[in-house]
Amino acid sequence: IPECDVVIASGDMDTLQLVDDKHVQVFTLKKGINDTVLYDEEAVKQRYGFGPEFLPDFKGLKGDPSDNIKGVKGIGDKTATELIKNFGTIENIYRDLETRHSKLKTSFTPRVVELLEKGKEDAEFSKILGTIRRDAPITFSFPEKTWGEGVEMSKAEALFQELEFRQLAERLRGAV
């Protein structure tokens, strides 16, 4: 498939992990039907404090009841965000915990360290559950024709004139 720009229109915020500034953005509702947001990498960073690539780790730490993902019991949004800002991935968090001079043990409370130690399996499994797989074996090809090749301009213009769609008629002429 040639590289193309993709806008995912979804109310499921899990799709934000697919955002990348090269080609993928997510269009979603913010509040109500008229307040919308188009997320690129910067917008994801502004909302969460880290990039879209860390959203599965965030979900692995804090869980997500709406998706029945457990996470680490006792770890909420704020702590999960700070852990990701400091260590990035769940793998890095647990790698640090196993070192002799753990940065985590000196930067976070003993309670957080204990929760992470007890919740390691839940964190790792929750991350797996919260990750959208990108390796599904699919085949896709773009059609050979462009969409405008099938438009019968005379019929479209007659309809637009009948319905008094002047601007739409002009836009159609410009697009075909």
Regions found by a protein language model. Name each.
Residues 1-137, 170:
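Extended two-metal-dependent nuclease catalytic cores across DNA- and RNA-processing enzymes
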Residues 115-118, 128-176:
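Low-complexity, acidic/Ser/Thr- and charged residue-rich accessory regions of DNA metabolism proteins
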